[in-house]
């Protein structure tokens, strides 16, 4: 169903150009269709701010529930940004105080760049806890992506993420391990998810916290899980929202870090992402980069036109199905008053009625 362009945020026009259904606010007001209000706490760095909006907006807009989706982006002022990015946020984003006053039906919390050895030392730590704590009491369901999952497991459940021996970077096959949960209804029992992280929460840690793992990977680890009530918090360790080119952009960034001396070794390929044909192109490019760096020559451009058309996206349809299920279940139990999380007959400790004895 359609996204509603409830502000001048450039993401709406970009998505419209890509073929997504986006309707003007004045048109939406004349349609007799229920509204749903979804918050997006966007903690990503400046360069990824707008792309992250589009990735999550697209997944929500592709849901086929009978509702108009109003998306409310906001961020945390404690995250350091450029002057240009701050102007962008001031123009297009709401404040957390506005979000609290108006209410939400659902909330998505993105990942973030970290600079400290422990999450609790990050400048955004306490404000993030405030948002998550408010959401648990006032929002029907919160979806946590990557670092947000690690933060919730840390402060709410006492499970600290653990450093991996090497970066988990690539596209990994996952298997649904709880096929009866509504979030994975109609989803392929095996599906791919991109990962890009140095740390993880293991399945044992999820289960020690009383949480329920729904999908995991032999190489990628636990990906999808839900809180003890089976719905109010949804955890993702991977990045199902990623575009086809997201890992390519990360790979390009790491090449530039190598060329500038910020990393010692040339970056490896993200696992299970580049085809043999693309790898051959990139191996030749690696030789050119090393020569340019060693001889202090201008760096050659990454031959993206030769690469992009051969990148396969093997995860988006499953991500779309899971978000569709999430939105559908929120729709079924959220209160018509967006300041209230549940309808009167919904039990907060079992909102989907999955724990009731049969």
UniProtKB/Swiss-Prot annotation:
Q: Give site residues, Important for substrate specificity.
A: 196
Which locations, inside or outside the cell, does it occupy?
Cytoplasm
Biochemical pathway: Amino-acid biosynthesis; L-methionine biosynthesis via de novo pathway; O-succinyl-L-homoserine from L-homoserine: step 1/1
- What Pfam families is this protein classified in? HTS
Presence of the UniProt keyword Amino-acid biosynthesis in the record? yes
Q: Where does substrate bind?
A: 167, 196, 253
Query: What reaction does this enzyme carry out catalytically?
Result: L-homoserine + succinyl-CoA = O-succinyl-L-homoserine + CoA
Broad class of where this protein is predominantly found:
cytoplasm
State the active site: 146 (acyl-thioester intermediate), 239 (proton acceptor), 241
What InterPro entries does the record point to? Class_I_gatase-like, MetA_family
Entry EC number(s): 2.3.1.46
- GO term, biological process aspect, one: methionine biosynthetic process
Report which superkingdom the organism of origin falls in: Bacteria
- What SUPFAM superfamilies does this protein map onto? Class I glutamine amidotransferase-like (SSF52317)
Task: List the residues marked with site Important for acyl-CoA specificity.
Answer: 113, 147
| Molecular function via GO | homoserine O-acetyltransferase activity; homoserine O-succinyltransferase activity
What EC class does the entry list? transferase
Give the GO cellular component terms, alphabetically.
Answer: cytoplasm
Q: Which UniProt keywords apply?
A: Acyltransferase, Amino-acid biosynthesis, Cytoplasm, Methionine biosynthesis, Transferase
Q: Which family does it belong to?
A: Belongs to the MetA family.
Any idea what job this protein has? Transfers a succinyl group from succinyl-CoA to L-homoserine, forming succinyl-L-homoserine.
For this entry, the protein name equals Homoserine O-succinyltransferase
